């Protein structure tokens, strides 16, 4: 199930870097993490849903790329984001 508009606005408001920010790496990673958590819960109850599993792996790869970009260019923002999201990195 995709993110609702209200949930997206909530995530943007929480993780935005400046007032009009909607596409910074922090916001993108937060949205991907929320979607990843939803898909993980879905797959716990539907373990044979392989198309959703493939989508989950694609989302994880995209989040990994964005986190690598942040780690390489803005290490302090990267560490703050990982702490706020509770990721194991």
UniProtKB/Swiss-Prot annotation:
The keyword Ribonucleoprotein applies. One of its GO terms (cellular component) is cytosolic small ribosomal subunit. It holds the Pfam family Ribosomal_S15. One of its GO terms (biological process) is translation. GO terms for molecular function: rRNA binding; structural constituent of ribosome. Part of the 30S ribosomal subunit. Forms a bridge to the 50S subunit in the 70S ribosome, contacting the 23S rRNA. One of the primary rRNA binding proteins, it binds directly to 16S rRNA where it helps nucleate assembly of the platform of the 30S subunit by binding and bridging several RNA helices of the 16S rRNA. NCBIfam families: S15_bact. Belongs to the universal ribosomal protein uS15 family. This is Small ribosomal subunit protein uS15.
């Amino acid at each position: 199930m995709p993110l609702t508009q209200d949930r997206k606005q909530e995530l943007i408001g929480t993780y935005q870097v400046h007032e009009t920010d909607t596409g910074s790496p922090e916001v993108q990673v937060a949205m991907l993490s929320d979607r990843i958590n939803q898909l993980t819960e879905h797959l716990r109850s539907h373990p044979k849903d392989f198309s959703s599993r493939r989508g989950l792996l694609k989302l994880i790869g995209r989040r990994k790329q964005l986190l690598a970009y942040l780690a390489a260019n803005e290490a302090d923002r990267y560490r703050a984001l990982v702490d706020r999201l509770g990721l194991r990195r």
